[in-house]
Amino acid sequence: MTDEYESYEAVVVGCGPGGAAAAATLARNGVETLVLERGVEAGSKNVSGGVLYAEESAPYTIDDLFPEIRERATERPITKNYIHNIAGQKVKTVDITELHHHDTAWADSVLRRTMDGWLEDQVHALTSETGGGLLTEIHVTGLLREDGEIVGVRTEELDPIRADLIVAADGVNSELARDAGLMDWEEPEEWFQGVKAVVDMPADVIAERFGIDDDEGEAHLFSGDLYDGVRGGGFLYTNRNSLSIGNVFHLDSIVAERAEVSELLDALLTHPLLGRWLGEEYRELEYSAKLVPDSKKVAHPEPHQGRMVLVGDAAGQMQAQGPIIKGMNHAVSAGGLAAEAFVEARSRGNPGKVGDRYEAKLRQSGVMDALRPTAYETTRAVTEHEGLTSLAGSVAQSSVGRLALRSMGGVVERLYNSPRLLSMLPDTRLPYVTLPTVLAEELGERVATTNDVEPPALDERIGDLTYDVGEPHITVQDESWEASGAAVTACPVSATDFGGGCYRAETVSENGSETRVVSLDTQPCIECGTCAVVADTEWEHPAGGKGVAFDQG
Protein backbone atom coordinates (compact mmCIF):
# COMPACT_ATOMS: atom_id res chain seq x y z
CA MET A 1 0.00 0.00 0.00
CA THR A 2 1.08 3.59 -0.63
CA ASP A 3 -0.96 5.41 2.03
CA GLU A 4 2.13 6.18 4.11
CA TYR A 5 3.76 8.21 1.34
CA GLU A 6 3.74 11.99 1.27
CA SER A 7 0.81 13.28 -0.75
CA TYR A 8 -0.08 16.44 -2.71
CA GLU A 9 -3.04 17.41 -4.81
CA ALA A 10 -0.74 17.95 -7.78
CA VAL A 11 2.85 17.09 -8.66
CA VAL A 12 4.43 18.89 -11.61
CA VAL A 13 7.61 17.32 -12.99
CA GLY A 14 9.82 19.91 -14.67
CA CYS A 15 9.93 23.70 -14.39
CA GLY A 16 10.28 24.72 -18.01
CA PRO A 17 7.60 26.95 -19.57
CA GLY A 18 5.00 24.15 -19.66
CA GLY A 19 5.56 23.01 -16.10
CA ALA A 20 5.72 26.59 -14.84
CA ALA A 21 2.44 27.44 -16.60
CA ALA A 22 0.73 24.40 -15.10
CA ALA A 23 2.07 25.03 -11.60
CA ALA A 24 1.17 28.73 -11.62
CA THR A 25 -2.37 28.07 -12.85
CA LEU A 26 -2.90 25.31 -10.30
CA ALA A 27 -1.56 27.38 -7.41
CA ARG A 28 -3.65 30.41 -8.35
CA ASN A 29 -6.69 28.14 -8.15
CA GLY A 30 -5.78 26.98 -4.66
CA VAL A 31 -4.37 23.58 -5.63
CA GLU A 32 -1.63 22.24 -3.36
CA THR A 33 1.18 21.80 -5.89
CA LEU A 34 4.69 20.37 -5.61
CA VAL A 35 7.13 21.00 -8.47
CA LEU A 36 10.09 18.65 -8.93
CA GLU A 37 12.99 19.89 -11.08
CA ARG A 38 15.88 17.65 -12.11
CA GLY A 39 18.52 20.36 -12.57
CA VAL A 40 20.50 22.30 -10.00
CA GLU A 41 18.28 25.16 -11.13
CA ALA A 42 15.44 25.32 -13.62
CA GLY A 43 16.98 25.89 -17.04
CA SER A 44 20.25 24.13 -16.27
CA LYS A 45 19.01 21.08 -18.20
CA ASN A 46 17.13 22.98 -20.90
CA VAL A 47 18.15 24.13 -24.37
CA SER A 48 16.21 26.13 -26.92
CA GLY A 49 17.07 28.01 -30.11
CA GLY A 50 15.18 29.99 -29.24
CA VAL A 51 12.34 32.40 -29.80
CA LEU A 52 9.41 32.45 -27.39
CA TYR A 53 6.19 33.42 -29.16
CA ALA A 54 3.00 34.80 -27.67
CA GLU A 55 0.23 34.06 -30.17
CA GLU A 56 -2.89 36.18 -30.33
CA SER A 57 -5.08 33.09 -30.74
CA ALA A 58 -3.47 31.09 -27.91
CA PRO A 59 -5.53 30.14 -24.85
CA TYR A 60 -2.56 31.10 -22.66
CA THR A 61 0.56 33.19 -23.19
CA ILE A 62 3.41 33.24 -20.74
CA ASP A 63 2.96 36.92 -19.94
CA ASP A 64 -0.66 36.19 -19.00
CA LEU A 65 0.72 34.04 -16.20
CA PHE A 66 3.94 35.92 -15.45
CA PRO A 67 3.36 39.58 -16.42
CA GLU A 68 6.94 40.72 -15.74
CA ILE A 69 8.69 38.03 -17.76
CA ARG A 70 9.63 40.19 -20.74
CA GLU A 71 11.26 42.82 -18.56
CA ARG A 72 12.93 40.32 -16.24
CA ALA A 73 13.78 37.16 -18.13
CA THR A 74 13.72 37.33 -21.94
CA GLU A 75 16.44 38.68 -24.22
CA ARG A 76 15.28 40.86 -27.15
CA PRO A 77 12.05 41.39 -29.05
CA ILE A 78 12.49 39.74 -32.45
CA THR A 79 11.12 42.38 -34.79
CA LYS A 80 12.57 41.23 -38.13
CA ASN A 81 12.95 37.78 -39.65
CA TYR A 82 14.84 36.74 -42.80
CA ILE A 83 15.63 33.48 -44.55
CA HIS A 84 18.85 33.19 -46.55
CA ASN A 85 18.87 30.63 -49.38
CA ILE A 86 22.47 29.63 -50.04
CA ALA A 87 24.32 28.10 -52.99
CA GLY A 88 28.06 28.28 -52.47
CA GLN A 89 28.81 31.98 -52.03
CA LYS A 90 25.57 33.14 -53.65
CA VAL A 91 22.66 34.05 -51.37
CA LYS A 92 19.04 34.93 -52.03
CA THR A 93 17.57 36.60 -48.94
CA VAL A 94 13.80 36.67 -48.40
CA ASP A 95 12.09 38.83 -45.79
CA ILE A 96 9.66 36.61 -43.84
CA THR A 97 8.79 39.18 -41.19
CA GLU A 98 5.15 39.05 -42.30
CA LEU A 99 5.04 35.31 -41.56
CA HIS A 100 6.85 35.89 -38.27
CA HIS A 101 4.21 38.40 -37.16
CA HIS A 102 1.24 36.27 -38.30
CA ASP A 103 -0.95 35.67 -35.21
CA THR A 104 1.90 37.02 -33.06
CA ALA A 105 1.34 39.35 -30.12
CA TRP A 106 5.09 39.41 -29.44
CA ALA A 107 8.15 37.20 -29.88
CA ASP A 108 11.35 37.41 -27.83
CA SER A 109 14.66 35.60 -28.02
CA VAL A 110 15.43 33.70 -24.81
CA LEU A 111 18.22 31.87 -23.04
CA ARG A 112 16.74 29.09 -20.98
CA ARG A 113 18.99 29.25 -17.91
CA THR A 114 18.04 32.90 -17.42
CA MET A 115 14.35 32.55 -18.23
CA ASP A 116 13.63 29.25 -16.51
CA GLY A 117 15.67 30.26 -13.48
CA TRP A 118 13.48 33.33 -13.11
CA LEU A 119 10.35 31.22 -13.61
CA GLU A 120 11.55 28.91 -10.84
CA ASP A 121 11.51 31.77 -8.33
CA GLN A 122 8.00 32.82 -9.34
CA VAL A 123 6.66 29.27 -9.24
CA HIS A 124 8.24 28.54 -5.88
CA ALA A 125 6.58 31.62 -4.39
CA LEU A 126 3.16 30.78 -5.85
CA THR A 127 3.15 27.09 -4.92
CA SER A 128 4.42 27.77 -1.40
CA GLU A 129 1.28 29.81 -0.74
CA THR A 130 -0.91 26.72 -1.22
CA GLY A 131 1.11 24.26 0.86
CA GLY A 132 3.39 23.04 -1.89
CA GLY A 133 6.69 24.32 -3.19
CA LEU A 134 9.53 23.53 -5.57
CA LEU A 135 12.46 21.17 -5.13
CA THR A 136 15.51 21.05 -7.40
CA GLU A 137 17.97 18.19 -8.02
CA ILE A 138 15.18 15.60 -7.96
CA HIS A 139 15.20 12.94 -10.68
CA VAL A 140 11.71 11.53 -11.19
CA THR A 141 12.32 8.02 -12.49
CA GLY A 142 8.81 6.76 -13.12
CA LEU A 143 5.23 6.37 -12.02
CA LEU A 144 3.91 5.09 -8.70
CA ARG A 145 1.11 2.57 -9.27
CA GLU A 146 -1.39 0.89 -6.98
CA ASP A 147 -3.41 -2.04 -8.33
CA GLY A 148 -2.32 -0.99 -11.81
CA GLU A 149 -3.54 2.58 -11.37
CA ILE A 150 -1.22 5.61 -11.50
CA VAL A 151 -1.25 7.24 -8.07
CA GLY A 152 1.98 9.25 -7.98
CA VAL A 153 5.65 9.36 -8.93
CA ARG A 154 8.89 7.65 -7.94
CA THR A 155 12.16 9.52 -7.57
CA GLU A 156 15.81 8.63 -7.17
CA GLU A 157 16.34 10.92 -4.17
CA LEU A 158 13.05 10.81 -2.22
CA ASP A 159 10.40 8.33 -1.18
CA PRO A 160 7.52 7.97 -3.66
CA ILE A 161 5.00 10.81 -3.69
CA ARG A 162 1.26 10.42 -4.15
CA ALA A 163 -0.82 12.95 -6.10
CA ASP A 164 -4.30 13.40 -7.53
CA LEU A 165 -2.71 14.96 -10.63
CA ILE A 166 0.68 14.35 -12.22
CA VAL A 167 1.81 16.85 -14.85
CA ALA A 168 4.65 15.36 -16.86
CA ALA A 169 6.54 18.41 -18.12
CA ASP A 170 9.87 16.60 -18.00
CA GLY A 171 10.93 17.33 -21.54
CA VAL A 172 11.57 15.50 -24.76
CA ASN A 173 13.27 12.61 -22.94
CA SER A 174 10.30 12.16 -20.59
CA GLU A 175 10.68 9.07 -18.46
CA LEU A 176 7.08 9.42 -17.29
CA ALA A 177 5.72 9.40 -20.84
CA ARG A 178 7.75 6.29 -21.63
CA ASP A 179 6.76 4.58 -18.37
CA ALA A 180 3.11 5.08 -19.31
CA GLY A 181 3.70 3.78 -22.84
CA LEU A 182 2.49 7.05 -24.35
CA MET A 183 5.71 7.97 -26.18
CA ASP A 184 8.66 6.04 -27.58
CA TRP A 185 11.96 6.75 -29.32
CA GLU A 186 11.82 4.19 -32.09
CA GLU A 187 11.81 6.17 -35.35
CA PRO A 188 14.47 8.78 -36.30
CA GLU A 189 12.10 10.32 -38.89
CA GLU A 190 9.87 11.50 -36.04
CA TRP A 191 12.54 13.71 -34.51
CA PHE A 192 14.76 16.69 -35.18
CA GLN A 193 18.08 17.44 -33.56
CA GLY A 194 19.11 20.98 -32.68
CA VAL A 195 22.74 21.99 -32.09
CA LYS A 196 23.66 25.50 -30.97
CA ALA A 197 26.51 27.81 -30.05
CA VAL A 198 25.92 30.88 -27.90
CA VAL A 199 28.39 33.49 -29.13
CA ASP A 200 29.58 36.43 -27.04
CA MET A 201 28.78 39.85 -28.52
CA PRO A 202 28.31 43.10 -26.56
CA ALA A 203 25.04 44.96 -27.01
CA ASP A 204 26.69 47.94 -28.71
CA VAL A 205 28.37 45.65 -31.26
CA ILE A 206 25.05 43.92 -31.95
CA ALA A 207 23.43 47.31 -32.48
CA GLU A 208 26.14 48.34 -34.94
CA ARG A 209 26.40 45.12 -36.94
CA PHE A 210 22.68 44.45 -37.22
CA GLY A 211 21.56 48.07 -37.36
CA ILE A 212 19.06 47.70 -34.52
CA ASP A 213 18.10 49.54 -31.34
CA ASP A 214 17.87 48.08 -27.83
CA ASP A 215 14.18 47.29 -28.28
CA GLU A 216 14.72 45.49 -31.59
CA GLY A 217 16.11 42.12 -32.61
CA GLU A 218 16.50 39.93 -35.65
CA ALA A 219 16.13 36.29 -36.62
CA HIS A 220 18.10 34.96 -39.59
CA LEU A 221 17.41 31.50 -40.99
CA PHE A 222 19.57 29.54 -43.44
CA SER A 223 18.92 26.79 -45.98
CA GLY A 224 20.47 25.46 -49.17
CA ASP A 225 23.64 23.57 -50.06
CA LEU A 226 25.90 24.39 -47.11
CA TYR A 227 24.90 21.20 -45.25
CA ASP A 228 25.91 18.54 -47.79
CA GLY A 229 22.34 17.46 -48.45
CA VAL A 230 21.20 17.04 -44.83
CA ARG A 231 17.55 18.13 -44.50
CA GLY A 232 17.13 21.09 -42.19
CA GLY A 233 18.49 24.55 -41.74
CA GLY A 234 20.27 27.06 -39.58
CA PHE A 235 19.33 29.98 -37.36
CA LEU A 236 20.81 33.11 -35.81
CA TYR A 237 18.97 35.04 -33.10
CA THR A 238 20.11 38.26 -31.47
CA ASN A 239 20.13 38.21 -27.66
CA ARG A 240 20.96 41.15 -25.37
CA ASN A 241 24.69 40.48 -25.21
CA SER A 242 25.13 37.40 -27.36
CA LEU A 243 23.99 35.57 -30.47
CA SER A 244 22.38 32.14 -30.61
CA ILE A 245 23.58 30.37 -33.76
CA GLY A 246 22.74 26.80 -34.66
CA ASN A 247 21.10 24.19 -36.84
CA VAL A 248 17.99 22.03 -36.67
CA PHE A 249 18.01 18.88 -38.82
CA HIS A 250 15.76 15.91 -39.42
CA LEU A 251 17.37 13.16 -37.37
CA ASP A 252 16.82 10.49 -40.02
CA SER A 253 18.69 12.66 -42.53
CA ILE A 254 21.65 13.04 -40.14
CA VAL A 255 21.74 9.26 -39.81
CA ALA A 256 21.35 8.59 -43.54
CA GLU A 257 24.16 10.98 -44.47
CA ARG A 258 26.36 9.93 -41.52
CA ALA A 259 26.78 13.66 -40.96
CA GLU A 260 28.86 14.92 -38.03
CA VAL A 261 26.69 17.58 -36.48
CA SER A 262 29.46 19.67 -34.92
CA GLU A 263 30.97 20.01 -38.40
CA LEU A 264 27.61 21.08 -39.81
CA LEU A 265 27.52 23.83 -37.19
CA ASP A 266 31.01 24.91 -38.23
CA ALA A 267 29.87 25.01 -41.88
CA LEU A 268 27.32 27.65 -40.89
CA LEU A 269 29.62 29.60 -38.58
CA THR A 270 32.35 29.88 -41.22
CA HIS A 271 30.17 30.71 -44.24
CA PRO A 272 31.08 34.10 -45.78
CA LEU A 273 27.54 35.38 -45.17
CA LEU A 274 28.06 35.23 -41.41
CA GLY A 275 31.18 37.34 -41.77
CA ARG A 276 28.73 40.22 -42.02
CA TRP A 277 28.03 39.83 -38.29
CA LEU A 278 30.91 37.81 -36.81
CA GLY A 279 34.36 39.28 -36.32
CA GLU A 280 37.85 38.01 -35.54
CA GLU A 281 37.04 38.29 -31.84
CA TYR A 282 34.64 35.31 -32.12
CA ARG A 283 34.17 33.60 -28.75
CA GLU A 284 31.73 30.82 -27.93
CA LEU A 285 30.13 30.93 -24.52
CA GLU A 286 28.47 27.53 -24.76
CA TYR A 287 27.87 24.57 -27.05
CA SER A 288 24.63 22.63 -26.58
CA ALA A 289 22.14 20.32 -28.26
CA LYS A 290 18.73 18.78 -27.82
CA LEU A 291 16.34 16.33 -29.41
CA VAL A 292 13.22 17.99 -30.82
CA PRO A 293 9.88 16.22 -31.48
CA ASP A 294 8.25 16.66 -34.89
CA SER A 295 4.75 17.44 -33.67
CA LYS A 296 3.01 16.73 -36.96
CA LYS A 297 4.11 13.11 -36.51
CA VAL A 298 4.40 12.57 -32.75
CA ALA A 299 2.22 15.12 -30.92
CA HIS A 300 0.07 12.73 -28.91
CA PRO A 301 -3.65 13.22 -29.69
CA GLU A 302 -4.53 11.76 -26.27
CA PRO A 303 -1.66 12.93 -24.03
CA HIS A 304 -2.89 11.45 -20.77
CA GLN A 305 -3.27 8.24 -18.82
CA GLY A 306 -5.22 7.98 -15.61
CA ARG A 307 -4.36 10.96 -13.46
CA MET A 308 -1.24 11.87 -15.49
CA VAL A 309 -1.15 14.44 -18.31
CA LEU A 310 1.75 15.24 -20.65
CA VAL A 311 2.62 18.81 -21.62
CA GLY A 312 5.24 20.37 -23.89
CA ASP A 313 8.02 18.29 -25.42
CA ALA A 314 6.99 15.32 -23.25
CA ALA A 315 3.81 15.18 -25.34
CA GLY A 316 5.57 15.94 -28.63
CA GLN A 317 4.11 19.46 -28.70
CA MET A 318 6.74 21.23 -30.83
CA GLN A 319 5.63 22.81 -34.11
CA ALA A 320 8.28 22.89 -36.84
CA GLN A 321 6.37 23.73 -39.98
CA GLY A 322 8.43 25.65 -42.47
CA PRO A 323 11.24 27.92 -41.33
CA ILE A 324 9.67 29.06 -38.05
CA ILE A 325 9.77 26.82 -34.99
CA LYS A 326 7.30 27.17 -32.13
CA GLY A 327 7.45 25.00 -29.06
CA MET A 328 7.63 26.91 -25.79
CA ASN A 329 4.41 28.79 -26.53
CA HIS A 330 2.52 25.52 -27.08
CA ALA A 331 3.97 24.13 -23.85
CA VAL A 332 2.61 27.17 -22.01
CA SER A 333 -0.85 26.70 -23.53
CA ALA A 334 -0.81 22.99 -22.74
CA GLY A 335 0.30 23.57 -19.15
CA GLY A 336 -2.41 26.15 -18.57
CA LEU A 337 -5.08 23.96 -20.16
CA ALA A 338 -4.02 20.90 -18.16
CA ALA A 339 -4.29 22.85 -14.91
CA GLU A 340 -7.62 24.33 -15.97
CA ALA A 341 -8.92 20.84 -16.77
CA PHE A 342 -7.95 19.57 -13.31
CA VAL A 343 -9.54 22.51 -11.51
CA GLU A 344 -12.79 21.96 -13.40
CA ALA A 345 -12.76 18.18 -12.88
CA ARG A 346 -12.03 18.59 -9.17
CA SER A 347 -14.86 21.11 -8.75
CA ARG A 348 -17.24 18.52 -10.20
CA GLY A 349 -16.00 15.88 -7.80
CA ASN A 350 -14.32 13.78 -10.47
CA PRO A 351 -10.61 14.68 -10.74
CA GLY A 352 -10.02 11.40 -12.57
CA LYS A 353 -11.61 12.95 -15.67
CA VAL A 354 -8.78 15.47 -16.01
CA GLY A 355 -7.26 13.68 -19.01
CA ASP A 356 -10.42 13.70 -21.09
CA ARG A 357 -11.02 17.36 -20.29
CA TYR A 358 -7.43 18.25 -21.15
CA GLU A 359 -7.61 16.41 -24.47
CA ALA A 360 -10.84 18.22 -25.37
CA LYS A 361 -9.35 21.60 -24.47
CA LEU A 362 -6.32 21.00 -26.69
CA ARG A 363 -8.65 20.33 -29.62
CA GLN A 364 -11.15 23.10 -28.93
CA SER A 365 -8.46 25.75 -28.42
CA GLY A 366 -6.81 24.99 -31.77
CA VAL A 367 -3.56 23.84 -30.18
CA MET A 368 -3.75 20.34 -31.67
CA ASP A 369 -4.52 21.66 -35.14
CA ALA A 370 -1.42 23.85 -34.97
CA LEU A 371 0.67 20.88 -33.86
CA ARG A 372 -0.79 18.41 -36.36
CA PRO A 373 -2.00 20.60 -39.26
CA THR A 374 -4.74 19.07 -41.37
CA ALA A 375 -3.19 20.52 -44.52
CA TYR A 376 -0.04 18.46 -43.99
CA GLU A 377 -1.97 15.28 -43.26
CA THR A 378 -4.10 15.61 -46.40
CA THR A 379 -1.25 16.45 -48.78
CA ARG A 380 1.70 14.37 -47.55
CA ALA A 381 0.73 11.29 -49.59
CA VAL A 382 1.46 13.36 -52.69
CA THR A 383 4.11 15.82 -51.52
CA GLU A 384 6.23 13.12 -49.84
CA HIS A 385 5.75 10.48 -52.55
CA GLU A 386 9.26 9.36 -53.45
CA GLY A 387 8.72 9.27 -57.20
CA LEU A 388 6.91 12.59 -57.36
CA THR A 389 9.49 14.24 -55.10
CA SER A 390 12.32 13.01 -57.30
CA LEU A 391 10.53 14.29 -60.40
CA ALA A 392 9.88 17.68 -58.80
CA GLY A 393 13.54 17.96 -57.84
CA SER A 394 14.64 17.17 -61.38
CA VAL A 395 12.24 19.74 -62.82
CA ALA A 396 13.40 22.41 -60.34
CA GLN A 397 17.01 21.89 -61.38
CA SER A 398 16.26 21.78 -65.11
CA SER A 399 16.57 24.74 -67.46
CA VAL A 400 12.77 24.97 -67.60
CA GLY A 401 12.48 24.99 -63.81
CA ARG A 402 15.22 27.58 -63.46
CA LEU A 403 13.54 29.80 -66.03
CA ALA A 404 10.28 29.53 -64.10
CA LEU A 405 12.01 30.50 -60.85
CA ARG A 406 13.64 33.51 -62.47
CA SER A 407 10.32 34.66 -63.90
CA MET A 408 8.54 34.40 -60.55
CA GLY A 409 11.17 36.20 -58.50
CA GLY A 410 8.67 38.74 -57.22
CA VAL A 411 6.30 36.00 -56.07
CA VAL A 412 8.85 34.17 -53.94
CA GLU A 413 8.46 36.46 -50.94
CA ARG A 414 4.68 36.06 -50.97
CA LEU A 415 5.02 32.27 -51.05
CA TYR A 416 7.46 32.24 -48.13
CA ASN A 417 5.05 34.38 -46.11
CA SER A 418 2.02 32.12 -46.64
CA PRO A 419 1.11 30.24 -43.42
CA ARG A 420 -1.21 27.98 -45.40
CA LEU A 421 1.46 26.95 -47.88
CA LEU A 422 4.05 26.35 -45.18
CA SER A 423 1.61 24.15 -43.23
CA MET A 424 1.81 21.71 -46.16
CA LEU A 425 5.60 21.71 -46.40
CA PRO A 426 6.84 18.14 -46.95
CA ASP A 427 9.73 16.51 -45.10
CA THR A 428 11.85 16.02 -48.21
CA ARG A 429 15.03 17.44 -49.72
CA LEU A 430 12.98 19.57 -52.11
CA PRO A 431 12.07 22.47 -49.75
CA TYR A 432 15.16 22.22 -47.53
CA VAL A 433 17.96 21.71 -50.06
CA THR A 434 16.97 21.63 -53.73
CA LEU A 435 14.70 24.66 -54.10
CA PRO A 436 16.74 26.97 -51.81
CA THR A 437 19.90 26.08 -53.73
CA VAL A 438 18.35 26.69 -57.15
CA LEU A 439 16.73 29.88 -55.85
CA ALA A 440 20.14 31.17 -54.73
CA GLU A 441 21.82 30.14 -57.96
CA GLU A 442 19.24 31.90 -60.13
CA LEU A 443 18.22 34.92 -58.03
CA GLY A 444 20.98 35.29 -55.46
CA GLU A 445 23.88 37.69 -55.16
CA ARG A 446 27.48 36.80 -54.40
CA VAL A 447 28.48 37.46 -50.78
CA ALA A 448 30.97 40.31 -50.59
CA THR A 449 32.11 39.74 -47.00
CA THR A 450 34.81 37.40 -45.76
CA ASN A 451 34.64 35.28 -42.65
CA ASP A 452 37.71 34.70 -40.47
CA VAL A 453 35.94 32.75 -37.72
CA GLU A 454 37.78 29.70 -36.40
CA PRO A 455 35.28 27.70 -34.31
CA PRO A 456 36.59 25.78 -31.30
CA ALA A 457 37.42 22.11 -31.74
CA LEU A 458 34.94 19.63 -30.30
CA ASP A 459 37.17 18.83 -27.32
CA GLU A 460 37.32 22.55 -26.46
CA ARG A 461 33.54 22.83 -26.67
CA ILE A 462 33.09 19.88 -24.34
CA GLY A 463 35.80 21.16 -22.00
CA ASP A 464 34.01 24.48 -21.57
CA LEU A 465 30.79 22.84 -20.34
CA THR A 466 29.93 22.40 -16.67
CA TYR A 467 29.54 18.81 -15.42
CA ASP A 468 28.93 17.13 -12.10
CA VAL A 469 29.58 13.60 -13.24
CA GLY A 470 27.47 10.94 -11.56
CA GLU A 471 26.95 7.26 -12.27
CA PRO A 472 26.66 6.13 -15.92
CA HIS A 473 23.07 6.61 -17.05
CA ILE A 474 23.19 5.04 -20.54
CA THR A 475 24.15 1.51 -21.50
CA VAL A 476 24.61 0.16 -25.02
CA GLN A 477 22.46 -2.93 -25.47
CA ASP A 478 23.89 -3.90 -28.86
CA GLU A 479 27.41 -2.61 -29.48
CA SER A 480 27.57 -3.75 -33.11
CA TRP A 481 28.25 -1.10 -35.74
CA GLU A 482 25.03 -2.03 -37.54
CA ALA A 483 22.86 -1.44 -34.47
CA SER A 484 24.58 1.53 -32.83
CA GLY A 485 27.18 2.96 -35.21
CA ALA A 486 24.99 5.92 -36.16
CA ALA A 487 25.57 7.38 -32.69
CA VAL A 488 29.26 7.97 -33.47
CA THR A 489 28.37 10.73 -35.93
CA ALA A 490 24.88 11.79 -34.79
CA CYS A 491 25.86 12.36 -31.14
CA PRO A 492 26.70 16.08 -30.81
CA VAL A 493 29.72 15.36 -28.61
CA SER A 494 31.12 12.53 -30.74
CA ALA A 495 32.82 12.26 -34.13
CA THR A 496 34.48 9.56 -36.21
CA ASP A 497 38.08 10.64 -35.56
CA PHE A 498 37.50 12.03 -32.06
CA GLY A 499 38.29 9.85 -29.08
CA GLY A 500 37.06 12.17 -26.31
CA GLY A 501 33.31 12.01 -26.91
CA CYS A 502 30.54 9.70 -25.80
CA TYR A 503 30.64 7.27 -28.71
CA ARG A 504 33.68 5.79 -30.44
CA ALA A 505 34.16 3.21 -33.16
CA GLU A 506 36.56 0.40 -32.30
CA THR A 507 37.83 -2.64 -34.17
CA VAL A 508 37.91 -5.89 -32.21
CA SER A 509 39.98 -8.84 -33.40
CA GLU A 510 38.75 -12.31 -32.49
CA ASN A 511 39.60 -15.70 -33.99
CA GLY A 512 41.38 -14.11 -36.92
CA SER A 513 38.51 -11.82 -37.91
CA GLU A 514 37.90 -8.16 -37.22
CA THR A 515 34.59 -6.69 -36.09
CA ARG A 516 33.65 -3.03 -35.85
CA VAL A 517 31.90 -2.17 -32.60
CA VAL A 518 30.82 0.89 -30.65
CA SER A 519 32.00 1.90 -27.17
CA LEU A 520 30.43 4.44 -24.83
CA ASP A 521 31.68 6.89 -22.20
CA THR A 522 28.82 8.86 -20.62
CA GLN A 523 31.07 11.44 -18.93
CA PRO A 524 30.83 14.08 -21.73
CA CYS A 525 27.11 13.39 -22.33
CA ILE A 526 24.92 16.48 -22.78
CA GLU A 527 21.72 14.46 -22.31
CA CYS A 528 20.15 15.32 -25.66
CA GLY A 529 18.67 11.83 -26.11
CA THR A 530 19.90 11.38 -29.69
CA CYS A 531 21.48 8.00 -29.01
CA ALA A 532 18.23 6.72 -27.51
CA VAL A 533 16.75 6.97 -31.00
CA VAL A 534 19.65 6.14 -33.33
CA ALA A 535 21.37 3.40 -31.29
CA ASP A 536 20.33 0.35 -29.29
CA THR A 537 20.62 1.77 -25.78
CA GLU A 538 19.01 1.72 -22.37
CA TRP A 539 18.67 5.46 -21.68
CA GLU A 540 17.69 7.38 -18.58
CA HIS A 541 18.56 10.73 -17.03
CA PRO A 542 21.38 11.09 -14.50
CA ALA A 543 20.54 11.55 -10.84
CA GLY A 544 19.17 14.91 -9.77
CA GLY A 545 21.76 17.66 -10.09
CA LYS A 546 24.24 15.37 -11.85
CA GLY A 547 25.46 15.46 -15.43
CA VAL A 548 25.68 18.57 -17.55
CA ALA A 549 24.48 21.97 -16.32
CA PHE A 550 24.02 24.56 -19.06
CA ASP A 551 24.90 28.13 -18.15
CA GLN A 552 23.08 29.62 -21.17
CA GLY A 553 20.61 27.04 -22.46
Which residues make up each language-model segment?
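N-terminal Rossmann-like FAD-binding beta1-loop-alpha1 element of flavoenzymes
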Residues: 5-35
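Core beta-strand elements of the Rossmann-like FAD/NAD(P) dinucleotide-binding domain
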Residues: 5-8, 156-165, 304-307
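N-terminal FAD cofactor-binding segment of flavoenzymes
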Residues: 29, 39-88
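Short beta-strand to alpha-helix junction loop
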Residues: 100-121, 254-260
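Iron-sulfur cluster-binding cysteine motifs and their immediate structural context
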Residues: 485-513, 519-553
